[in-house]
C-alpha cells in the first residue's frame, strides 16, 4: 500500500521500543528455539507461584525477573490486584515496562513454520500489524489493505481509506487449539493444521475472544486497559484473564478510535492443558460469559473518558453496577480494576506538557 514501507518495518526490529513479557512457572528452555528472533529484545519475566523456586533463563538474554515477593515489594498493598497462580500475572510486566510496544508469549509456545517451510518471525509480523493502520469502520473483503499485494476493493469509501492507528495485534497458533474445557473433552485429539495467510481488522462494535499466548499491543495507546483481571488462586474463576482484557480493551479501542487486528503471525502451541483441571477453573466463567459478553457489547463510554485509563475506570464503575447481580465476585473484580489503574499511574505518571503560557498540564 502506497505510503507505508513494509520492508523497512520488517527490517527494523524496534528493539529499543518493544519489551517481551513472559509469565512462567517453569524453566524457560523454550527460549533457545526463539533465540534467532528474540535475543535482541529485553525480556520481562513474571514468575508465578512459589517465589522460592529458581527459574533458569538461557544465557545471552537481557531480562528482568519478577516473582511474587517482587510484586509485593513494588506495589505494596496494591499487589492484591495482580492474579496469583494464573497467567494473568503477566500484566504486572505490562505495568513495569517503559516501552511503546509489548509482545507477550506463553512458555509452551515455539516457532512455527509457514507453508513454504520457513520459520515465522512473529515479532516482525506483529510490528508490521501495529505500524500500519486498521480499518474498523468498513470491512475490506481482501482483508488487510496495507499488506503487500493487496489494496482497498471497489466500493470502499475513499474517506475511510486512511484507516486508524492500530492498538492490538492478535496472533494465532498451530497444533494445540485454544479450546475451552468442554470442547477439549469432546475433541481431545484435534489439532489446528490450517494456516490462513490473512490479517484482518475486527470491525467496530464487534467483540472477540482474545488469547494472551501470542499477543502484541501498543502500550502507549491501551496499556491501562490491558488488565488481565483478578483470577486464579483465591478467586472463583480462572482462564478468563485474557478474555476479560480483550473485551475491555476492544471497547476502549472502539471508543478512542483505535483498531484491533487478528490473524498472522502464527506460532506453535505445543502443550495441551488438562481439560479436567480446566473445567474446574472455567465452570463459572462458562456460565458468566453469557452475561459478560452482552455487558461489553452494550457498553458505551462517555466523552469525558478520553484516555485508556479514564475509560477503564468508567468500565470498572459499570462492572460494579451491572455485573454484581450476576455474582458478588464482580464487585471484587471492579475494585481490583480501580487498584490496577492506581498502581499503573503510580508507576507510569502522566507525562506533563507545556501550555503556551509555560505552565505544566497533564497530557491526555
UniProtKB/Swiss-Prot annotation:
Q: Name one GO molecular function term.
A: intramolecular transferase activity
Instruction: Name the keywords, alphabetized.
Output: Cell wall biogenesis/degradation, Cytoplasm, Glycoprotein, Golgi apparatus, Isomerase
Annotated motif DXD motif: location in the chain?
106-108
The record's tissue-specificity note reads: Specifically expressed in developing seeds.
**Family matches, as InterPro entries:** Nucleotide-diphossugar_trans (IPR029044), RGP (IPR004901), RGP_fam (IPR037595)
Looking at the UniProt record, the site noted as Required for activity sits at: 154, 161
Recorded GO CC terms: cytosol; Golgi apparatus; plastid
Which cofactors are reported in the record for this sequence?
Mn(2+); Mg(2+)
Q: So what EC number does this one have?
A: 5.4.99.30
Q: Where in the cell is it found?
A: Cytoplasm, Cytosol; Golgi apparatus
Biological-process GO terms, alphabetical:
cell wall organization; plant-type cell wall organization or biogenesis
What post-translational modification does the entry describe?
Reversibly glycosylated in vitro by UDP-glucose, UDP-xylose and UDP-galactose, but not UDP-mannose.
Location (main, coarse): cytoplasm
Q: Which residues are glycosylated?
A: 154
- Which reaction(s) are listed as its catalytic activity? UDP-beta-L-arabinofuranose = UDP-beta-L-arabinopyranose
- Enzyme class comes to isomerase
> What functional role does this protein have?
Probable UDP-L-arabinose mutase involved in the biosynthesis of cell wall non-cellulosic polysaccharides.
Stated family: Belongs to the RGP family.
The record's note on quaternary structure and interaction partners says: Heteromers with RGP1 and RGP2.
Question: What does its UniProt record remark on the domains?
Answer: The conserved DXD motif is involved in enzyme activity.
Q: What is this protein called?
A: Probable UDP-arabinopyranose mutase 4
Supply the source organism for this entry.
Arabidopsis thaliana (Mouse-ear cress)
Amino acid at each position: 500500500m502506497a505510503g507505508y514501507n513494509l520492508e523497512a518495518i520488517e527490517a527494523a526490529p524496534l528493539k529499543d521500543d518493544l519489551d517481551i513479557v513472559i509469565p512462567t512457572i517453569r524453566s524457560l528452555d523454550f527460549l533457545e528455539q526463539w533465540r534467532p528472533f528474540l535475543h535482541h529484545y529485553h525480556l520481562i519475566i513474571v514468575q508465578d507461584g512459589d517465589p522460592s523456586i529458581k527459574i533458569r533463563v538461557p544465557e545471552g538474554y537481557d531480562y528482568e525477573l519478577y516473582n511474587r515477593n517482587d510484586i509485593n515489594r513494588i506495589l505494596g498493598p496494591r499487589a492484591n490486584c495482580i492474579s496469583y497462580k494464573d497467567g494473568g500475572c503477566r500484566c504486572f510486566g505490562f505495568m513495569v515496562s517503559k516501552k511503546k510496544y509489548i509482545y507477550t508469549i506463553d512458555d509452551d509456545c515455539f516457532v512455527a513454520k509457514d507453508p513454504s517451510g520457513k520459520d515465522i518471525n512473529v515479532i516482525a509480523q506483529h510490528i508490521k500489524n501495529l505500524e500500519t493502520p486498521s480499518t474498523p469502520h468498513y470491512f475490506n473483503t481482501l482483508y488487510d489493505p496495507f499488506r503487500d499485494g493487496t489494496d482497498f476493493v471497489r466500493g470502499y469509501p475513499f474517506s475511510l481509506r486512511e484507516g486508524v492507528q492500530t492498538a492490538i495485534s492478535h496472533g494465532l497458533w498451530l497444533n494445540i487449539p485454544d479450546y475451552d474445557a468442554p470442547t477439549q473433552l469432546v475433541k481431545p485429539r484435534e489439532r489446528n493444521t490450517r494456516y490462513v495467510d490473512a490479517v484482518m481488522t475486527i470491525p467496530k462494535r464487534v467483540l472477540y475472544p482474545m488469547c494472551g499466548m501470542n499477543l502484541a499491543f501498543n502500550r502507549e495507546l491501551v496499556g491501562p486497559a490491558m488488565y488481565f483481571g483478578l483470577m486464579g488462586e483465591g478467586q472463583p474463576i480462572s482462564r478468563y484473564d485474557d478474555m476479560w482484557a480483550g473485551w475491555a480493551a476492544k471497547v476502549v479501542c472502539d471508543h478512542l478510535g483505535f483498531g484491533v487486528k487478528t490473524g498472522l503471525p502464527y506460532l506453535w502451541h505445543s502443550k495441551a492443558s488438562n481439560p479436567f483441571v480446566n473445567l474446574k477453573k472455567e465452570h463459572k466463567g462458562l456460565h458468566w460469559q453469557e452475561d459478560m459478553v452482552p455487558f461489553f457489547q452494550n457498553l458505551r463510554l462517555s466523552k469525558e473518558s478520553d484516555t485508556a485509563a479514564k475509560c477503564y475506570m468508567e468500565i470498572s464503575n459499570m462492572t460494579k453496577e451491572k455485573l454484581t447481580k450476576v455474582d458478588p465476585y464482580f464487585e471484587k473484580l471492579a475494585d481490583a480494576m480501580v487498584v490496577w489503574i492506581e498502581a499503573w499511574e503510580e508507576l507510569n505518571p502522566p507525562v506533563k506538557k507545556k501550555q503556551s503560557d509555560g505552565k505544566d498540564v497533564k497530557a491526555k
